[in-house]
């Protein structure tokens, strides 16, 4: 190691290494060939270099010094020499490209391919709250992926939508139009009877001079016609300004020229019905219907026919022009990749009900057959009750997001009566449910065919012992009244509890938990109230397998059991019970106006419309009065109060 000094002699007297001597004041001096340094900064820097050298030496030799602390040095930023070059992102393990146009992206021959690859990978993000990866090109081929629907779904796995009745909506709009047509209810009206009116004595004198017979004098707006109402027969009377400006000579000449140009011997006009109104006419009507609240910001007030047209569009969107139609999707989404995709799009709701009911009946009928053909060793009454419950749960999960997962005609009819489910979808849903139950019973029967043959004693022997596993039949000692009310009570409990679980104003379960609770509800009804009649509570669950049973050996006798039980018991009891259960819940708990129980009368609608218009007027009138109050304060210094609603 060599040591330097600021003031060293030209030649060294000895080659002996210098020795350090530490003085009491902390200064370091060199003996023999080096003079003592008198500057503190030079000594400090020399000492620091020496300590750093010792630290490096200790690190190189593998040793460490615990008594000495090395100085901290800032980390140098590593500069990538290739930062300006295009570095393509290498896909992670398991990332493959199946399409031919994507296989070429694996080789990065030029910067353009790398840029395309980088853009491709940046688009592949997780969709929504799901952790599932969606390929960006998959999204291009499936535009509906991740798109939000703007249509109601009466699902049993989420709170029910709040849909207004079409007749009630039309009545609400009509009441609104009638209220706005009155002079005292128009926006911008300056009726003297209102608080905060800006009517002055000069206005009254001017109106009394030019008042026409048959007009109201209680409202200035009836004379001035500031609000251009639709269908007004009387032309508005324009008020002359107090300080009119004299027209110039040039203006008079222009007017006279126009009159000369437009003077013809023949006068003709086209009636309103002689041609269809064009887009320009509609725009001019809209401009005429513009209202100004503060003199600068125009506010467009929709025409009555426009309100009715919008309401018809909204209600038709809720009902759906066809089964499975969704109005929230763009025209690009309506292009289908193949022919079957188009069929599925228009029939996805019936398909969903079909699959949901099929899953329900497979589990339910399978549980019945397993407990019967094994003579209790393969199941019990409790196990078959849970089989029906979990089958119902899975059926709702299968169809809940598409059709709602009703899988029960009693539920569908109750939804149509009390929750404004479209009536034109009711028969389609019921037919799909019956067909799904038919195939579900057929699959369960085919699964247990060998066990049924062994239990019956031959392949051509079929009795009601196994037939009762496919369809319902009351016990022989149960009277018809008792059997009917068994189904009535069971279905009323089912539908009433469903209305409570699906009411967002009550205490709905968490997201996705409603179907699980419905499954436990069905199992509880079976274990507590299902022994005497095999708890039908679902007409489709009975009719579908009954039709199948009559076709495979049980014969028409399946329909004649217990005085045609399937008509008044399996269908009449559950449907009547479901309606009664929903009615009881709406009478005592539900407050939504979509239910016939809470349907508002004319007085309530007029009251609500009046309150809305009153609040709207005072909001606008308050703005105008504030502005006028500012102007008056500048002149008189008095404060003008804003009118308040009584």
UniProtKB/Swiss-Prot annotation:
Transmembrane region(s): 351-371, 384-404, 428-448, 482-502, 510-530, 570-590
InterPro entries, per the entry: Aquaporin-like, MIP, MIP/Aquaporin, MIP_CS
Biased composition (Basic and acidic residues): 19-41
Regions of this protein lying in the Extracellular compartment: 372-383, 449-481, 531-569
Motif NPA 1: chain residues: 408-410
Keywords linked to the UniProt accession: Cell membrane, Membrane, Repeat, Transmembrane, Transmembrane helix, Transport
UniProt membrane topology term: Multi-pass membrane protein
Sequence ranges of Polar residues compositional bias: 190-201
CDD domains: MIP
GO aspect biological process, one term: transmembrane transport
Domain note: Aquaporins contain two tandem repeats each containing three membrane-spanning domains and a pore-forming loop with the signature motif Asn-Pro-Ala (NPA).
Protein name: Aquaglycerol porin AQY3
Organism whose genome encodes this protein: Saccharomyces cerevisiae (strain ATCC 204508 / S288c)
Gene encoding the protein: AQY3
């Amino acid at each position: 190691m060599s040591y330097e000094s600021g003031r060293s002699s030209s030649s060294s007297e000895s080659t002996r290494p210098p020795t350090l001597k530490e003085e009491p004041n902390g200064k370091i001096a060199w003996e023999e060939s080096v003079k003592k340094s008198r500057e503190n900064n030079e000594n400090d820097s020399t000492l620091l270099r020496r300590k750093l050298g010792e630290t490096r030496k200790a690190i190189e030799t593998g040793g460490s010094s615990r008594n000495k602390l090395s100085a901290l040095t800032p980390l140098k930023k590593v500069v990538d020499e290739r930062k300006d070059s295009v570095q393509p992102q290498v896909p992670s393990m398991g990332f493959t490209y199946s399409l031919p146009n994507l296989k070429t992206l694996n080789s990065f021959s030029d910067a353009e391919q790398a840029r395309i690859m980088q853009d491709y990978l940046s688009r592949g993000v997780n969709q929504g709250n799901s952790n599932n990866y969606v390929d960006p090109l998959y999204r291009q081929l499936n535009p509906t992926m991740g798109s939000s629907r703007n249509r109601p779904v009466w699902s049993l796995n989420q709170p029910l939508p709040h849909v207004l009745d079409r007749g009630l909506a039309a009545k609400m709009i009509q009441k609104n139009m009638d209220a706005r047509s009155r002079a005292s209810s128009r926006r911008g009206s300056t009726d003297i009877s209102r608080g905060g009116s800006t009517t002055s004595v000069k206005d009254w004198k001017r109106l009394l001079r030019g008042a026409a017979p048959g007009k109201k004098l209680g409202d200035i707006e009836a004379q001035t016609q500031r609000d251009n109402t639709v269908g007004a027969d009387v032309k508005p009377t324009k008020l002359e300004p107090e300080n009119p400006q004299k027209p110039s000579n040039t203006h008079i000449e222009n007017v006279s020229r126009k009159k000369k140009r437009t003077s013809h011997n023949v006068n003709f006009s086209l009636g309103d019905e002689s041609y269809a109104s064009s887009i320009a006419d509609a725009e001019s009507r809209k401009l005429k219907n513009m209202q100004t609240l503060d003199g600068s910001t125009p506010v467009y007030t929709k025409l009555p026919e426009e309100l009715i047209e919008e309401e018809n569009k909204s209600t038709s969107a809720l009902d759906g022009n066809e089964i499975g139609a969704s109005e929230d999707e763009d025209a690009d989404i309506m292009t289908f990749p193949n022919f079957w995709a188009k069929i599925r799009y228009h029939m996805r709701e019936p398909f969903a009900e079909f699959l949901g009911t099929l899953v329900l009946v497979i589990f339910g009928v399978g549980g019945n057959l397993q407990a019967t053909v094994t003579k209790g060793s393969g199941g019990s009454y409790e196990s078959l009750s849970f089989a029906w419950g979990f089958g119902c749960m899975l059926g709702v999960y299968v169809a809940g997001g598409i059709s709602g997962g009703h899988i029960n005609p009693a539920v569908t009819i109750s939804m149509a009566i009390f929750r404004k489910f479209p009536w034109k979808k009711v028969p389609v849903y019921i037919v799909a449910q019956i067909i799904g139950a038919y195939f579900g019973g057929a699959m369960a029967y085919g699964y247990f065919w060998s066990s049924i043959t062994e239990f019956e004693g031959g392949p051509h022997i079929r009795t009601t012992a196994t037939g009762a596993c496919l369809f319902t039949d009351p016990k022989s000692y149960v009277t018809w009244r008792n059997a009917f009310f068994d189904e009535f009570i069971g279905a009323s409990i089912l539908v009433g509890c469903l209305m409570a679980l699906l009411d967002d104003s009550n205490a709905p379960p968490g997201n996705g938990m409603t179907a699980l609770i419905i499954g436990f509800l069905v199992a509880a009804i079976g274990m507590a109230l299902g022994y005497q009649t095999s708890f039908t509570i679902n007409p489709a669950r009975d009719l579908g397998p009954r039709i199948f049973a009559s076709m495979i050996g049980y014969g028409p006798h399946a329909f004649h059991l217990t005085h045609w039980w399937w008509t008044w018991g399996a269908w009449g009891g559950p449907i009547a019970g479901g309606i009664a259960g929903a009615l009881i819940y709406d009478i005592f708990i539900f407050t939504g106006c979509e239910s016939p129980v809470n349907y508002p009368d004319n007085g309530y609608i007029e009251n609500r419309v009046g309150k809305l218009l009153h609040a709207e007027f005072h909001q606008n009138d308050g703005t105008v009065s504030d502005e006028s109050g500012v102007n008056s304060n500048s002149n008189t210094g008095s404060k003008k109060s804003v009118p308040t609603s009584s």
